[in-house]
From Swiss-Prot:
Has antibacterial activity against Listeria monocytogenes. InterPro entries: EF-Tu_GTPase, P-loop_NTPase, T_Tr_GTP-bd_dom, TrpB-like_PALP_sf. PANTHER family: ELONGATION FACTOR TU, MITOCHONDRIAL, ELONGATION FACTOR TU-RELATED. It comes from Bacillus velezensis. GO terms for biological process: alpha-amino acid metabolic process; defense response to bacterium. GO terms for molecular function: GTP binding; GTPase activity; translation elongation factor activity. It comes from the Bacteria. This is PCM7-4. Signal peptide: none annotated. Keywords: Antibiotic, Antimicrobial. The keyword Magnesium does not apply. Transmembrane segments: none annotated.
Length: 376
């Protein structure tokens, strides 16, 4: 780890390293890797970044952001627009790192690219290119072929990343849960829950959200998952459908997606589904696929399968893109500004297909997909 820090020009001599085991800590272990390590980690954070001082009494209404969490772009900060791939001429692959976006500069069509960038903190300042006064999420950039768009962001608050070894989702969530267990006070008095709800509503109203009208359901997901009764889940579902009638749960959808075991299987089964339902997929009738949050590498798997199904070609390779890969005249990208997302975008420039991944935290990247037995 010290060598890695030196390679990245980070101060290994002053970086505090705390060995922990989040699972042991959650199980109540009092040893060096359990509770003691979690408390040492919190102390190290406070010592390394003394300002702003960590709030120990403030009401925390949402989990802390630990590590890479692309879905927080819509929850915690300001979306900036950013495009990382350099312009590439046809056949020129020498300067393109393997796995990043490789788009050809076609001149006979106009591409409308909607690109969402990385998250800035709530006090971040977005520096725009010359001549641009304002950028809003969802702005369209009209340009033939490849677009390079590079506003930068300055941060006024320090950022802390808590790194883990192993599976990024399991590691960071387990460690976050362990930190919460030992550093948060349990509200186990039913009468205090009413006060907590009042504070939450006041906080929502402070930021111009409808605090008085927002439905709040008190429950424990862990307890509900282990219980035979589904009262909390059912109550949440009813409140959601009543509050958002236009996006109510689909109870009679025609496509039997539940019978599929994976998103890769979904892409292989799509031709049969479209034929059964009499659905046409072409430039005038594009296919939109929305993937829910928390599915890890599914966006990459779905994109990989879609390219094989509809184009008969492999995604994530360095071969020159064929003319059959020519994108639609109007393509929308849900862009998160990450190298792994860049590779997903390569697979998304397919005929009449729009893939909108909302979470890729567990995606292992192009090298894993192309070079591993699991990926193949």
């Amino acid at each position: 780890q010290a060598n890695d820090l030196d390679y990245a020009s980070l101060p290994d001599s002053v970086v505090e390293q705390v060995r922990t085991n989040g699972q042991l800590a959650l199980e109540g272990d009092k040893g060096e890797l359990g509770e003691q390590a979690i408390l040492s980690l919190a102390q190290a954070l406070d010592t390394y970044i003394p300002t702003p001082e960590r709030a120990v009494t403030a009401l925390d209404t949402m989990p802390s952001a630990v590590g890479y969490q692309p879905t927080l772009a819509e929850e915690m900060g300001v979306l900036q627009e950013r495009y990382l791939a350099d312009t590439a001429n046809k056949g020129d692959l020498s300067n393109i790192p393997f796995g990043t976006v490789n788009l050809l500069a076609y001149n006979n069509y106009q591409a409308y690219l909607t690109m969402l960038g990385k998250t800035t903190d709530v006090t971040g300042n977005c520096e725009l290119p010359e001549g641009v006064e304002m950028v809003m999420p969802g702005d369209n950039i009209k340009n033939p072929g490849v677009t390079k768009y590079l506003p930068t962001t300055s941060y006024s608050l320090p950022h802390v990343n808590v790194g883990t070894i192993g599976h990024v989702d399991h590691g960071k969530t387990t460690l976050t849960a362990a930190l919460t267990r030992y550093l948060a006070d349990l509200v186990d008095d039913a009468e205090l829950l009413e006060l907590v709800e009042m504070e939450v509503r006041d906080l929502l109203s402070t930021y111009d959200f409808p605090g008085d009208d927002t439905p709040i359901i008190i429950g424990s997901a862990r307890v509900s998952a282990a219980a035979s009764e589904l009262a909390v889940q059912l109550k949440m579902a009813v409140v959601h459908d009543d509050t958002n009638p236009t996006s109510a749960a689909q109870t009679n959808a025609p496509w039997g997606l539940a019978r599929l075991s994976s998103y890769w299987g979904l892409t292989l089964h799509l031709p049969n589904l479209t034929e059964e339902q009499g659905v046409t997929i072409d430039e005038d009738h594009p296919l939109f696929i929305y993937l829910p949050c928390g599915i890890g590498g599914a966006p990459g798997g779905a994109a990989y399968g879609l390219k094989n199904v509809f184009l008969g070609s492999s995604a994530g390779t360095t071969r020159e893109v064929e003319h059959s890969d020519k994108p639609l005249h109007d393509i929308s990208y849900a862009y998160l500004g990450d190298a792994r997302q860049n590779w997903v975008m390569t697979a998304q420039t397919t005929q009449a297909i729009r893939l909108e991944p909302s979470a890729t935290a567990g995606f292992a990247g192009p090298e894993f997909i192309v070079n591993s037995n699991q990926g193949r």
